[in-house]
Amino acid sequence: MLASPEPKGLVPFTKESFELIKQHIAKTHNEDHEEEDLKPTPDLEVGKKLPFIYGNLSQGMVSEPLEDVDPYYYKKKNTFIVLNKNRTIFRFNAASILCTLSPFNCIRRTTIKVLVHPFFQLFILISVLIDCVFMSLTNLPKWRPVLENTLLGIYTFEILVKLFARGVWAGSFSFLGDPWNWLDFSVTVFEVIIRYSPLDFIPTLQTARTLRILKIIPLNQGLKSLVGVLIHCLKQLIGVIILTLFFLSIFSLIGMGLFMGNLKHKCFRWPQENENETLHNRTGNPYYIRETENFYYLEGERYALLCGNRTDAGQCPEGYVCVKAGINPDQGFTNFDSFGWALFALFRLMAQDYPEVLYHQILYASGKVYMIFFVVVSFLFSFYMASLFLGILAMAYEEEKQRVGEISKKIEPKFQQTGKELQEGNETDEAKTIQIEMKKRSPISTDTSLDVLEDATLRHKEELEKSKKICPLYWYKFAKTFLIWNCSPCWLKLKEFVHRIIMAPFTDLFLIICIILNVCFLTLEHYPMSKQTNTLLNIGNLVFIGIFTAEMIFKIIAMHPYGYFQVGWNIFDSMIVFHGLIELCLANVAGMALLRLFRMLRIFKLGKYWPTFQILMWSLSNSWVALKDLVLLLFTFIFFSAAFGMKLFGKNYEEFVCHIDKDCQLPRWHMHDFFHSFLNVFRILCGEWVETLWDCMEVAGQSWCIPFYLMVILIGNLLVLYLFLALVSSFSSCKDVTAEENNEAKNLQLAVARIKKGINYVLLKILCKTQNVPKDTMDHVNEVYVKEDISDHTLSELSNTQDFLKDKEKSSGTEKNATENESQSLIPSPSVSETVPIASGESDIENLDNKEIQSKSGDGGSKEKIKQSSSSECSTVDIAISEEEEMFYGGERSKHLKNGCRRGSSLGQISGASKKGKIWQNIRKTCCKIVENNWFKCFIGLVTLLSTGTLAFEDIYMDQRKTIKILLEYADMIFTYIFILEMLLKWMAYGFKAYFSNGWYRLDFVVVIVFCLSLIGKTREELKPLISMKFLRPLRVLSQFERMKVVVRALIKTTLPTLNVFLVCLMIWLIFSIMGVDLFAGRFYECIDPTSGERFPSSEVMNKSRCESLLFNESMLWENAKMNFDNVGNGFLSLLQVATFNGWITIMNSAIDSVAVNIQPHFEVNIYMYCYFINFIIFGVFLPLSMLITVIIDNFNKHKIKLGGSNIFITVKQRKQYRRLKKLMYEDSQRPVPRPLNKLQGFIFDVVTSQAFNVIVMVLICFQAIAMMIDTDVQSLQMSIALYWINSIFVMLYTMECILKLIAFRCFYFTIAWNIFDFMVVIFSITGLCLPMTVGSYLVPPSLVQLILLSRIIHMLRLGKGPKVFHNLMLPLMLSLPALLNIILLIFLVMFIYAVFGMYNFAYVKKEAGINDVSNFETFGNSMLCLFQVAIFAGWDGMLDAIFNSKWSDCDPDKINPGTQVRGDCGNPSVGIFYFVSYILISWLIIVNMYIVVVMEFLNIASKKKNKTLSEDDFRKFFQVWKRFDPDRTQYIDSSKLSDFAAALDPPLFMAKPNKGQLIALDLPMAVGDRIHCLDILLAFTKRVMGQDVRMEKVVSEIESGFLLANPFKITCEPITTTLKRKQEAVSATIIQRAYKNYRLRRNDKNTSDIHMIDGDRDVHATKEGAYFDKAKEKSPIQSQI
């Protein structure tokens, strides 16, 4: 009998151990083993380092076969491991390979040693990198074939080594068992065939060599495991991808029905009556309509002007008519003429790539009414899909993070135990070390103890001690001798004197002032700059270099060189000083101007005095280190995509370049060489891909370009989004990192405190007229401004303040711990946000209501709490937050205001006992009743909406509409008087103090002032600018509607704490802006040909002087680009366009072509300036965006915790409605229809209510959608007739369905909303089929019927009808819908205000660039169209370009605008910049919070699943399924249906089949007839999910009480047995039956063989079942609880 082998440490793998393992595995296969739950140990996976708990690795164990240390492989798999000298684990199959090579064969052992050797892996990695470098080269050297053959030989040798070491296929860990080896083998085979075959293969196959780049991934274990995680994420995203395709298909079909063929409508030149006869004759020629020169083109446009036949569509100029002719725009690739191109256009809209052009094209061709379609697709649908991807990825990331955390928790005890063992041996080791040292130093003893020297543990300890020393000992002696200056006493006195000066607080204050002044001097550089300014800046630079040099010298004297360079900030300061000195020395050397760029490093000196800056920089560096594998994987993918694109399309761009450029020159964006291909891939990842895809399809075709681009878009965006989530999580976990303790920050605080102390002293002395300031006052000043230490404050604290001081004893300890634990993860902690595991939504809302009542009753105490919870006495941001909270919350307490009315002390101290006093009190009470009356509030709300709505009529046509103008003037007067009256009533009711202490009333007061000023502005001509302040009137809406109040409060809470981080981000942008000024100032000027509007070639015009010399003959223009880097302000604006990817291509083109100041730009002469913009997008956009969103999410979670886990963007009423919404989402609210008694009707009822009938209807809907996809713009008459009859057939089928349901449901048919919807679809479909026969197909297009029928596809999203994955993905959106609607209301209000402001300021701007007939500010509707476009960050650069037309050469300031007195069409650049920048920031902030709301809903669901808590939703789902199994509401189901019922439930109550054993183990009570009660099943399933949870008893009691309330007449039947007992009885009966049969068999020998064959299997099965259920009974925890 063989013993079960157990691994003990590292044991050599021998033939004996091999036989032992084989016998053990064979035995476990034959026996009923108990180790089914055994899984591989994560720390012992292939490629990881062997943990140190397994001891040291002796020399004889390196590269030698060892017994597997993982119990899973040791007991279940026939494997062994091999370790290299780096302790890396390699696992091999122990079976013989190639039928002869056993693990002990010398050939196989040699190949294993080669394979595991670190040098072999390094050699392969170097070979791959060399191959990558040569694959990126366009012009290869002559010796390329030699190198390629050498690399091919290396890869072939590697494959042979792996084959001999691992085997080909059989067993675990074989060569072909690894997918990466499949890739490597396939690429090598392709390369051999292509290289040595005489045939010419397809060029595409030659690109297979680029797959070799991916070989970097398996050579790095971190990359390999990360790819596995991303593949797991992709699996979870499958449902999202399917739903995305579903919605894209629906919108594509709608687009086909609305816009098919419309984009071919163009303005065509049609001969007039007075034109010659020749032209009339030409129009009869069919080729005339195809000639492109007969179309109308706008100036500078490549494609003809689109038009439409609707009144709100684009109109043609005089002499042109709108006809359908020519091809579609954008080289024919933009259209809705077929399903494929419509899908392409919708995908482009969803990705929001260049949407403004498609948006304008459709509105020109079809009309502005279709703006609704774009709002739904570009904003709502795009937002929803992005939220889905982010939510699912966030869930996957958190699951992976939790999995790693659980693994580390399991392994931690082992490491702690090992650490204890090592710690116990420390004393003995130290004693032995001391003995050795004593013997070494003793002159008597020369021998050492051999047994001590041979101690392996002691040697290991000594090696660790040696490794801690960074430098050799002689370097420390050198530093002590030469770098520590303790010379003469005079030097020590001088050093002490310098130390006092340089370390004084005011010295640091002086230095920080110098740093700020230096930054200001850096920002003053501009172009053109006068000589005086240039001289001033140079002198300033010399002064600052001198100051920083003196600081360094004095600190070296005060601290010694050794102490000085021990501080990181001092090393950084010395680098800045050395750079400044080197720059001075090389100032006149040609080519050294780039040294000026390193001046930007001086800005980072602020981090020494700015803790937030310092901590964020540290968090950034730590995050990059932690995420190095993810960054490396992203770079590998970009490199591979660039090389693959270059190999696949490079030759096509060279051969077919004339297809995309009229001059047959390569465009800026192509893939002919590696660098341009790399830039193209980077542009795709930035979201700008459609224009380069058009060019690619022109030169290489659609079959290869579209798959390549889809691959880059999907995989690249997955990597970028995953990196973004990892950064957000990393920043969130780094927020507890404390700032480094430095004296400079403390000294700065002390200096500021002393200055304030002195100022207070002087003020007190002046005010009090005394000689001495009271000591208590001065002590208070010191206590406020002098803090202990800035280093103890975390990132989360520093993000909540603008000052550098922080009081550490202000916040409550409990709340702080809860917040810190919560913010460690993206998922809110359920222990904080959920107090009860069942019906958490209800309990939260109920508790919240109680809290609201308590807060209303104790308002004064709440204000005291606000003051106590202030995180810093000196923090301006915290003060602002507390004031906002007080003004917004305090003003809403009507009780507080009513108390103020009764007191009556704020409007005069009139005694209430006098007659006048009583009259005054009665007046105030009356006013209070009026303003508190609900009807008065509704009236004021209505007047507010009317006064806001009237602003929409004040457009450029108002002067032509005299009646409307007069009505609006009277309305303004009435509204003004009403609001003044309301203000006076509230003054009388509440008093001045109460009124002006409320923030909303202060806002109302400001709006009333605006009303008054606008009326005053109409009276005097010089006061007319006051009228434009009307745009502030809609702000009053905020104070009238609770939903907007809630959103504004939430935005203030989540946004104000980010100001400090926002300032840090601005500093990063400032660095890039100053760099841009140094690189590009004055270099964006170019000589423009006025006739063509294009730039002159540099070969014709070399510089500015040449251009000006041509100016005398022709009107040549030496113009500057509107977006430039001539100063820091322009640099910020240009960087904002790059950050929003609007106009960034134009800016980069100007930078790439720039040569020097006053030199004509040349095409791509400075191409590597792309690196500047790439670095800005990474370090100036991506990373700061991650930091900002991290802080916003942290504050979102903090305030959500304060509200008990409720959403901070919904009102109290909406929180109650939230429960109802969840109930609607989880259950079907319709009442069941009774089954008819008639047999025929009953049969039809059973048919239409069956699941099969529902499936058939869904299939019909899908087939009908597929039939619509066949339709095209240009198709044969036969196809049109066939599609007509197909639509008719579907209409008949849906009519039959409607008739069958009418027969089955009778009058109950119309009680179901979905049936009414289907009935209306049938009616409209029949009408749509019949109308064309009477009124013609022009008035009723055939697509109308198709769109009506398509509306039925919404059934796919129904709960319980469509796919379950759709419901799960729609759930978070629907649950967050109330909050989203509130936020959308605020967005609409912001758009309304900005639309009115735009009409007042930009209505008459010249139509150019982004301002055209569709997008302009002439009317309110057009302004809203523009602002919607800007809200999705599309095309605002073009609008700003048009507004920048303020010079006489660009616009006409005296132009007469018909119908109005306004003159000119010039813009106002400063107002335009403020307008667009502010709107972009506000809309970005609001939209980011929209994303956070939906993503947090996803994570809340994930949090509940993770913690195995059962919510009310889970129980609703349970009873919903129960209705299907118990339609008669008996509260019982048959035990035979229990298995199906458990499998039909949703997780976590779900039990997958086979589940009979688990159900029997639950030991459920059974009544007569083998029936089981609903409550018993629910309780048992709940206990199975929650286990031994401490909340179990409370949950059970709530379930029982809730069930009794819902079912007061419980049908009770006494249980007669249980499921476990019934199974035991059945097993016992089987055993008795088997014994009796055996007895009969022994007596009847003739029938033994036949009966034995029948019953033998039954005996074995019964025995196993009996053993299983005996074991289940012993182990069942639920049975013991019952």
From Swiss-Prot:
Membrane-spanning parts: 118-137, 142-167, 179-196, 201-219, 238-259, 368-407, 506-521, 531-559, 569-586, 593-609, 627-655, 702-732, 935-953, 962-990, 999-1020, 1022-1040, 1056-1080, 1168-1202, 1251-1272, 1277-1305, 1313-1338, 1342-1362, 1378-1402, 1469-1504
Result when mutating F724E: Increased non-selective monoatomic cation leak channel activity
Segments of skewed composition (Polar residues): 820-834
Keywords linked to the UniProt accession: Cell membrane, Disulfide bond, Glycoprotein, Membrane, Phosphoprotein, Repeat, Transmembrane, Transmembrane helix
InterPro entries from the UniProt entry: Ion_trans_dom, Na_channel_asu, Na_chnl_inactivation_gate, Na_trans_assoc_dom, VGCC_Ca_Na, Volt_channel_dom_sf
One of the GO BP terms on file: cardiac muscle cell action potential involved in contraction
Annotated positions of the Phosphoserine modification: S442, S843, S869, S905
IV repeat coordinates: 1233-1531
Main location (coarse class): membrane
Record field: catalytic activity: Na(+)(in) = Na(+)(out)
Coiled coil stretches, renumbered: none
Glycoprotein recorded as keyword: yes
Keyword check for Disulfide bond: yes
Bias (Basic and acidic residues) ranges: 804-819
Glycosylation sites: N276, N281, N309, N1103, N1113
Domain commentary: The sequence contains 4 internal repeats, each with 5 hydrophobic segments (S1, S2, S3, S5, S6) and one positively charged segment (S4). Segments S4 are probably the voltage-sensors and are characterized by a series of positively charged amino acids at every third position.
Stated family: Belongs to the sodium channel (TC 1.A.1.10) family. SCN7A subfamily.
Stated name of the protein: Sodium channel protein type 7 subunit alpha
Annotated organism of origin: Homo sapiens
Gene name of this polypeptide: SCN7A
